[in-house]
Each structure stands twice: as structure tokens, then as C-alpha cells.
């Protein structure tokens, strides 16, 4: 395990899903102190602070608490930030050895929020009053993202998609979007996601699906500090049968993009791992959020190894708003080395292939799956 880790410790990083502020990267922001660097915007840590009894004014309040060389030190070669379709994308580009690219995240638009649709119409110079106009606006913004280096989309979902209801039914639902029932919203969402999946496939993009989250469960806290502040939890068991029907519909017409699946509830991972055998363009994503602990990462690796193929894993990502989170890659590589080393020691994996397996999971698989033009240096 020690030797395997040593051989991947210095590999470059491909962070294909994060929430960093691209402007802070572009301007090479110098943080005034360690507190802001480590805690600023990172609701994972805010949650832990509350559990330890820290007063809210020290977390999201105004109480007082040098990113400069972090990306270079950790050898970060690729960062995919998470961006709203109306974002101007002014700060993405190549900075030193690091490529910073946008990710298309249309959650606000697919929620049919009136303000979001107005913003989308303005950004795309298109009337979004009809389903046809809404789709055109999404495609115009998607192409704008692709022109700025976008290779990936991302969708955070409160419920899983199912079969496509068809254009006629979707147009009727969209026309009365402000009065839809929960089931009708699910129908329309499934149609829109299928439409976008077609567009992603045509543009050779990767589609990420995040699900299993129950957001903003503390109403009083949400009213005080807003969303993404540490008041989200894990949902119970997710109905992956719906997801299977959705992916099958895409695959049947040759429109399934390369897809990464993330469930916040780890009990879904075995089902997702077997799903990748039925739909080889899909991958189980990294252990996410509450699960990227030592036990959670190890459990995810073992589950993928048992039910799918460990050698197809896309490795680690930060999914973070904090530059300090790049330490997670070393954490992951140590756990992976221990896991693979144990397999070798037990005679379950050939020693001659272990180093290649480590390098593929830590770097090569993500580069190949995302079809990035990166050279290992």
C-alpha cells in the first residue's frame, strides 16, 4: 500500500466537479487569513461547527476570523466550476498549468422559477413563454458554454426522472407551469432532462446527475441564513427504477450521453453499480458529501469493485467551495492505495497491474471519460 501510494502521490489533479469561484482563481486572490480560506463558503464545515456549539455569528455572521499557490502546489490541471446558464463566463480560461472550465448547471431553469426564466430569456435573447422558446433559450446558452470550453453538465435533483412524456404533453404542462402538481412537475422535468441529454450527446458532453438530497429541512434556519448553509440532509431510499426507465429511453434512441451518477444515500450505490453493467456509458460517481469520509470512500470503492469494475472508477473530486479541499485528493489516494494494496496482499489482484490501476483511477480515467486534452507531466 505504501509503495502504491508513493507512485500516485504526485499525479496531477482533474477536479471535474467543484463550486469554486472562478474569479478568485483568475485574480489569484490572496485570502486575508487562514480562517477565511478554510471556512469561507464551506457549509460542510459550518455544519460541523454548529454541532460543536459554535455561535452562528462565527459561522455565517460578521465576526472576524493565501490561496495564492494552492493550485500550483497540488498540481491541479483541470477545474470544472458549477455555473448557472445565464453566467457570462468572464473568468474561465487557462491560468498557468490549470484549465478552468464551466459546467452547465440549469437547475434554476428546470425548476421553472419565473425569475430564472426571465433571466434566461434575456441572456439568450429569446422568448421563453412557450416550451419551444424555452428549449431554444437553453440550447443557445448551452452552445455559449461549449464555446467557452464546457465539457460537462450537472443536475441536482429532488426526484429522479422517468419516461419522457412526449412533446405534446410537455407543451401542455409548460403552458400552465405555475399550477402543476408534483407528479406533473416530474413529468415535465423528465421531458426536459431527456431533451438536454440529447443535446449533450450531440455535443459529446458528460452528464452528471446528483440525487438523494433533502434540502433546507430547518425552516427557521433557512429564513435566517438561506440555502447552502448546512441544513441539508440525506433522503431515504431512492427509487432507482425511475432512473433505469429514463436511461433506457435515452439509450433506445441512441441519445444517452456519458453519465456520472451520484447518490447521497449510500444504500443506493449497489443498485447504481449494477446499473452501469446494463448501461456501459454510465459510471458511479465519487463518494459524495456525507460519504467522503474514510469509511465512506472505502465502502464506495469496495461496492463498485464488488458490483461493477473498480478499474472504471473516475476517482476523486472536491465538490467544494474551498480551495483547501484539494487535500482531499491525497486523502483519497491513501485510502485507494490501502484498498488496492489489501487486494494484492490477499491474492485478489495481480501485483504487476496494481500501479496501472492506481494511475487510471487517480488520473487517467477522468481524462479519458471527459475527453480532455491533457498531458501527464
Predicted regions and their residues:
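Mid-to-C-terminal alpha-helical segments outside catalytic/metal-binding sites
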Residues: 1-12, 37-63, 310-311, 328-377
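Active-site-proximal loop/turn and secondary-structure-junction residues that shape catalytic pockets
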Residues: 85, 106-108, 157-159, 213-217, ...
